[in-house]
Structures are given as C-alpha cells and as structure tokens.
C-alpha cells in the first residue's frame, strides 16, 4: 500500500503548543519540491522564535542496499541555522532511538526523546522567559546528561490535531491514509524491536470514545481512509473490541488498516474489525519456525499464526504477512521451513526481509556484540544488520529466487 506521508508526531506536538497559547506553523517537507526554498519561505513569513524538526526514519532497514537518511535532515538543520538564530530542537520516533548520537550528527541545539506534547510547550515557556531549559523530561543537550523521561499516563488529556493543522488542503482527502494512534508503548519485548525506546514499555491508551470522536471529525472533513499506527491494534483485546464497537455505533463509513500481533485474537474481534471498516492487516509473524520464534522472543507459535490468519481470512480482511529472516539461530533449514509455512498460509501479500536491523539496548544488539558483529563503541546510528553465520551468500539469493516466482511477494 502506497501512503502519502503525513506527520502525526509533529501534528500532536503542534496541537499541544497551540493549546498552550503558542502560534505554530507546521511545514511538511515531504511535499516540498525545493526543500531550501520551502524552508526560506516559511522562516521569512513566520519568523519563528523556536524551530522543531521531527526525524521519523534513520534509514530504510534494507540490508542489501542500506540508505542512511540523516544527511538530508542535517542539511535542513543547516538551512534553518543560516536563515535565522532561533534554537533548533530535534525529536521524533527515529531521533528517540538514538538521542545522543543523532543530536551530535545533526548539530542541533537540543533534542527531545519520546513524547513531546508536554516537554516541547514547557521548553517554549522557558525560552520565552529566558531561563535555562535543562532538566525538562526527555531533553538532551550537547555534552550534558539527559533528563529523566516521563510518559503521559492520561492520553486523553493531550489534544488531538484538527485536519487543517497537518493535512494538506491542496490534495484530495481520498489520496491519504491518515495515521491515527490510539495506544502507545509495548511490553512484548521482541529481541530486535525499538518500540520501547520510542514509546516506553507500558501500554497507554486514549479512551475508545475519544478516538471514535477524532475519527468522526476526520470523516466529516472527508478523510475516511485510516492507518492505525498502533504497534499492535489487537492488544489489549478488550480495548480493540471496544474501539471497534464505538466506530460501529457512530456509523462511520471508513476504511482502515492496522498491525496485528498473531496471538490473543478470536473470531469476535476479527468480525468486529471487519464491521468497523478494517480492510487490511499487517501480520508480522516473522518466522515459520517455532525455534526461531523463541529466538526472537515472540509470544506466539506457528499454530497460533495459522489460527489467527484463518480468522482474518474468514472475516474477509486482506492479509499482508511479514517474514524476517536471518536472526540469531537461523539456518538454511529454518529459513526453508519459514518459506514453506508462508506459502501454506496463502496470504494475499507477503513481505520478506533478509537481515535484522540492530538497534541499541536490545537483546539483538547484545548478541551482535558478543559475536563480534558490532563493536562496543558502535552507536548504531548508521545502519548495522545481523545475519546468521554461514547464511550471507545463500539466503539473499534464495529469497530473490523465491520472490521471482511469486507475484504477491515483495
């Protein structure tokens, strides 16, 4: 599915700043043909006292041909610096995984790790008063110890952005799958995952009523295609069922797609999701080998994957599966087992990834360090990957052949 990029994170922070009484302009550079000119026009027209830059992705997670995405962001920082003297603060999901190394690389004035809806307005207040900003939750300053992070416990206390703040008016609403997040955090602790570094390990939720009201506001503006960016839509299951029920109660004629963890799903949930407008799920089952699922610290097994996949097929929902091959303990036999398993599931689409991106402070990073794949001083900002020993020559070629013979696989 091709999505026009919309900046949910900056929009949430911008909404919080407006609620605190600040004037805000949000510039989405994904739609800017000439980035430097777009920044110059915005700076000259708005004359900002503070500039915030959101960094969502560090790289493309492609081991075969990795693309490091930070150089253009550093150019954005340099352009802003050249045009005005306003302090530059970086944040966002990608930044939050690498708060110190990314801040050094980008040469910004400071960074906010994690949620910015509370920290950024507080920072603006201190800047306006001319008092030190150190000590704000999640704040990183060059050469100083980072402040302790905090996580909002009541997400409903945080404002949700109106469409006019962040969705371009010169495009048709039908062109967008609008990102919506109803929950933050993840306690599943998969061996390679960076979600906890971004959102924290505890699951926190907006009330289903608040999310349904936001969806209704979007629908009234013509935006009926929704991308739930929750790390796992089906967890907790009772919450997912209640949210679907609220959507159904309001009669919202919407379409949505989401990520599903292949456990803790029953037929009732799959049917409710279909009735609420779910058209597609991303099912990250990662492997068809129970041995490898244990290695990746997954909480499900292959039998549960089969059951969940069938439930969504029975509900008439398009299923896009995801395989992640080459992690610790992977062998030719386990990789072949995964490919045969994926074929048997008969997904409508399948994404196969070779090699696992190594993120800081994860079990995978510890394994890679112990095996000498990374060094103790490697900050991992530039993409590094784990591929099980003795699979380097064989696995990429095997997957290329597998994809070539199956039109639904990418």
Q: Where are the language model's segments positioned?
A:
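Acidic, low-complexity intrinsically disordered segments
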Residues: 1-220
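C-terminal accessory regions of radical SAM enzymes
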Residues: 140-143, 318, 333-410
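Conserved strand-turn element in the central/C-terminal portion of the radical SAM core barrel
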Residues: 29-32, 261, 288-297, 309-334, ...
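Radical SAM [4Fe-4S] cluster-binding motif and immediate context
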Residues: 160-322, 340
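A short acidic, helix-capping loop that chelates divalent metal ions and anchors anionic groups
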Residues: 59-63, 290-295, 363
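Non-cysteine beta-strand/loop elements that form the S-adenosyl-L-methionine
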Residues: 52-55, 116, 270-288, 350-356
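Catalytic cores of alpha/beta
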Residues: 99-105, 269, 329-343
